[in-house]
Regions:
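Membrane-embedded alpha-helical bundles of multi-pass transporters/translocases
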Residues: 2-456
Length: 456
């Protein structure tokens, strides 16, 4: 039986463009906040890492809180779209605040400024915006193929934006005056772009009526399915093993991204050319985009996402191992590093494309086993993973830089720092890919749902 289709091509493209706005925040923040704070503001990377870790203590609570609020929201715009729209206003303001720390403040005040702005951005505004954006996957269509297509469009825009930001930001900062003024101006430009694109994305789609989502028009039944408190929501998530696996996978992916962002330091202090960071960004993002183009076709051909995800991530793991080998062979092997980096990214692409569809399947699993509709709460794993994983990853990089005696005033770093940069950029990404591959090999939620439906 052919599934009903709900979306036009422009709905999918409009939805996907929302991650331009998301990555104007996330790619900019994760790739450059540490080098901005250490080399421009002059803060200690170890202290910055600790502040980020402290900030992350709030994230788990706010993710479930906002996810639950989305599930219980009833408005003319739907459940998720209001949160996506208004949450981004706060994202734009706090993003600028992070990259506009006054240089004439005392250091204690600078640390406090960063902590407050970073916490508000991550624990409040980005949480509301990103969970709502992700939840739309399950709220504007019930067609699994369309959900995969939405994920592919989303991450094509995400990686294209990430590539552009990683390629042009350092040059843009210099062109706009350099130093603190350059970073502040770039942040303002990115925030304005994000606001415009996020607004367009919100109004490019329309949520399905709640009765159609629930397969019932009985309002009392719908209200009963949504009747649970914050503690019960947390229990529903914890009781879904597939949610837990996706959440851990998401966190590991973001830590991976934080380690890859150390490419700015690796290119500067080991390869001797900071512009190579942009070249490596191309080697990562172009293959990812290519993989995303073909992901919907491959999912359809293989009748599901499981085999594709496991096989492609196995390729990624092997390739990251070869990147490490090439890196330790010496800085003259940049070509080999770029080649294996590209192959690894190609292997990571399918999971990025179908991940939101897998989360929708996890939400369906909770519906089939607990008869509770928790779409918004279920998608908290996306925001939680981005913030907790990205924050923890950035914190770890700060701690490791401090432990290895990194000194931003030196043009040549000590051997302890050089060795640590190699571990962060070469070894840890391989180890993380291996763990993710193991988790994906147990992500059999599609099969579980089929068995549950057959038993009804």
């Amino acid at each position: 039986m052919t599934e009903k289709r709900y979306l036009k091509w422009y709905n999918k493209v409009g939805y996907g463009s929302g991650d331009i706005a998301g990555n104007v925040v996330y790619a900019f923040l994760s790739s450059f906040v540490m080098i901005y704070l250490t080399n421009t503001v002059g803060l200690n990377p170890g202290i910055v890492g600790t502040l980020i870790a402290v900030s992350k203590l709030l994230d788990g609570v706010t993710d479930i809180f906002f996810g639950s609020l989305i599930d219980k929201t009833h408005s003319k715009m739907g459940k998720a779209r209001p949160w996506m729209l208004y949450g981004y206003i706060g994202c734009a303001i706090t993003l600028v605040a992070i990259f506009a720390i006054p240089t004439n403040l005392g250091q204690f005040a600078q640390y406090a400024w960063f902590l407050i702005a970073y916490t508000l951005l991550n624990a409040v505004f980005y949480t509301a915006n990103n969970i709502a954006y992700s939840a739309l996957t399950a709220l504007i269509t019930k067609n699994s193929a369309e959900q995969v297509e939405m994920g592919s469009w989303r991450f094509m825009f995400a990686f294209a934006t990430s590539l552009l930001i990683q390629s042009i930001t350092l040059g843009a900062v210099t062109a706009l005056g350099g130093g603190a003024a350059g970073w502040r101006t770039v942040a303002i430009i990115y925030a304005i772009i994000g606001l415009i694109v996020n607004t367009l994305s919100v109004f490019s789609v329309k949520e399905l009526p709640e009765g159609e989502l629930e397969d019932t028009t009985d309002k009392k039944e719908i209200e009963q399915d949504e009747k649970y408190n914050l503690v019960q929501a947390a229990k529903l998530l914890a009781g879904n093993k597939y949610y837990m696996m996706i959440c851990v996978t998401y966190i590991l992916q973001q830590i991976y991204g934080a380690m890859i962002s150390m490419g700015t330091y690796y290119a500067t202090y080991i390869l001797g050319n900071q512009n190579l960071f942009g070249v490596f960004s191309w080697a990562i993002n172009i293959p990812l985009i290519i993989a995303l183009v073909f992901t919907p076709t491959l999912v359809a051909k293989w009748n599901g996402m499981y085999k594709l995800n496991v096989m492609s991530y196995t390729l990624a793991t092997i390739s990251r191992a070869l990147v490490a080998v090439a890196g330790y062979m010496g800085s003259g092997n940049v070509t080999l590093m770029l080649l294996f980096t590209a192959i690894a990214a190609l292997g990571q692409g399918p999971w990025q494309g179908d991940m939101n569809a897998v989360i929708a399947a996890c939400s369906e699993y909770t519906w089939l086993t607990k008869h509770k509709r928790v779409d918004g709460t279920m998608y908290s794993c996306t925001s939680l993973g981005v913030k907790l994983g990205g924050g923890l990853g950035t914190a770890i990089t700060g701690w490791l830089l401090a432990a290895s005696h990194f000194d931003s005033a030196l043009t040549v770093q000590p051997d302890s720092c050089i060795n640590m940069l190699k571990i962060m950029y070469l070894v840890i990404p391989f180890a993380l890919d291996a763990i993710i591959t193991f988790l994906l090999s147990h992500m059999k939620v599609e099969e579980a749902n089929e068995k549950l439906r057959a038993a009804v």
